Amino acid sequence: MTHVVFAVPFAMDATLRFVEAATRLREEGLRLGVLSQDRPERFPEALRSRFDAFHRVPNAMDADLLTDGVRQLARSMGGRVDRVIGILEPLQEALAEVRERLGIPGMRPEAAANFRDKSRMKDLLRASGLPCARHRLWMGPEEAFGFGRESGYPLVVKPPAGAGARNTFRVDDEQELAGYLRTMPPRPSDPVLLEEFLSGREFSFDSVTLQGRHLLHSINEYAPTPLEVMQTPWIQWAVVLPRDISGPDYQAIHEAGPRALD
């Protein structure tokens, strides 16, 4: 029997779909504990009744509080936890800290930081021979304007550890960049990532990887691209899962996707 803790900071509908899928594995011998900062009543009763344990913490994004919460759940689940999981991207570094502290298998902090920090991720990808947009981690105005002159406009401005396309903007010239600097000034503790603007079709590559083996993957296309959606809120957008991904349009990502994970 496998004891799993699912970290669910907030009982959002999208997250609960994953929790509901996890509860189905109880028939296969899984025991499920849920760790959240929301009240138990925020979870639908039919779903909550399938939890083997539940623990609430003041802040489910804090590694120290999560660590204590996992220990509490372990006491309610036979004295051990075999896995700690969560689907929110901003949660991954904290979960990696919990696993390392408690000796639980799974992604460690270094690997989590590699994909959470987009500046670090691009440096690693480029070092491995995978092309990506030129970028600069911006902590002051001179760095920003220098990068703009070096790479040309437009530029993409975003947080280095964001999620989705939130707080992501396009600036078309130095005047717009100066305006961004006035409204959202970066600090050494809170830098901003600048990237050269690349246009084209945009895809995602999702993989199930176990101990370095890529067991399966899918490729989705954003229609239109996320940045275009953010700039034009009325657009009805979609994420398209193609039925056939064997053609030449997908050859490059078939090669680059596994290499990026390796």
Residue positions per predicted region:
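ATP-grasp fold ATP-binding core
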Residues: 125, 148-170, 188-200, 205-206, ...
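Hydrophobic anchor at the start of a short beta-strand
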Residues: 31-33, 132-133, 155, 192
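A conserved helix-loop-beta module that forms one wall/lid of the active-site cleft
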Residues: 100-167, 174
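Short amphipathic alpha-helices within nucleic acid-binding modules
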Residues: 176-180
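ATP-binding N-terminal substructure of ATP-dependent carboxylate-amine bond-forming enzymes
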Residues: 1-111, 142
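ATP-dependent carboxylate/phosphate-activation module, predominantly the ATP-grasp catalytic core
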Residues: 196-199, 203-261
